[in-house]
C-alpha cells in the first residue's frame, strides 16, 4: 500500500540542512525579562582594571619590542599574585605556550625576569611551559590538543606567544581571521580561562594610526579581543636623557655618602640632594681621594651608560568594558 507521498525532502542537501538544524548544539535564546532581577555575576578580574578571567587579551607591538618578555613577566606576576605594569594580578596557574624561542632560551628568560623584578620564586609550580618551536600547527588543529592537555590543570590564563606561527589562512582576510579568532573563544569557553596572545605591528610608520589599527593584518584582530594593549616606542629627547643622567649621578653620590660619610645629612638640603653638581663637589671635599676617584671614574660612567641604554615606551589600552 502507498501510505503517502511528498513527505520527505527534495534533495540530499535539504536533508543535510535539516539534520544539522535539529542536532545543533547552540544555546537557546533567552528572554531578558526572566533574568532582569537576577543578572549573572561578572567574571572576576585577572588583571585589575584590564582583563577578566575567561576573557581574551591581545598585546600588539613592533618586532623585537620585548613582547615576549612582557608576557613572561605577566606569567610570573599571575603565578606569584604580584603586579604587572602596576596592575595587580590574581594568583593562579598559568600556561605559557612558547612557539618562537628555543627551550633553553625560554626557560632562562623566566629566571632572568624573576631576577630583574626582584621577586622570590615561591610559586614556580603555578607556571607550566609548553615548548612548541618547530612543532607549530594551525590554531584550528592546535585548539583541541591544547584543550585536552589543559582540561584538568585549572589554569586561569593561557598565554600564546606569538600567534603568527599558528595563524590559519590569510591574516588580511576578515572571514578567515574571524574563524581563527573563534578558536580562542573555544579555548576560553571549554577551559574557563583567559587567553592572552601577542601579534606584531604592520610594516611602515605607525604614528598616524590609532592603536587599534596597528596590528598586522585584518581589523578582526582589533575587534575580537576584550582587551587590546598596544606598545609604541617613544624617542627620548636629549633634555630628558640629561635629566635622567642627573638623577643617576645623584643616586650614585648619595649611595657613596651613605656608605662612607653618613653625616652628610647635616650639611645637604633636599634641594642639594637633587643636584649632581652640588653632590659631586661635596663628595670631592668629604670623601677620600681613592673613594672619590672610584666614584668619578667607575660608578658614575656606568650609571650614565645605563641611562643611555634605556628605551621609552607608551602602552595604550583599548578595553571592551
Residues covered by each model-derived region:
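Conserved inter-motif catalytic segment of the P-loop NTP-binding fold
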Residues: 34-35, 42, 47, 89-175, ...
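Pre-Walker A (Motif I) flank of P-loop NTPase domains
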Residues: 53-57, 91-93
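Hydrophobic positions on the alpha1 helix immediately C-terminal to the Walker A/P-loop
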Residues: 70, 74
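N-terminal pre-Walker A segment at the start of P-loop NTPase domains
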Residues: 20-46
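Helix C-cap/alpha-to-beta connector motif
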Residues: 84-87
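Phosphate-binding/switch region of NTP-binding enzymes
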Residues: 58-59, 64, 68-69, 157, ...
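Short, small/acidic-rich helices and loops at N termini and domain boundaries
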Residues: 1-25
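Gly/Ala-rich phosphate-binding loop of Rossmann-like dinucleotide-binding domains
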Residues: 79
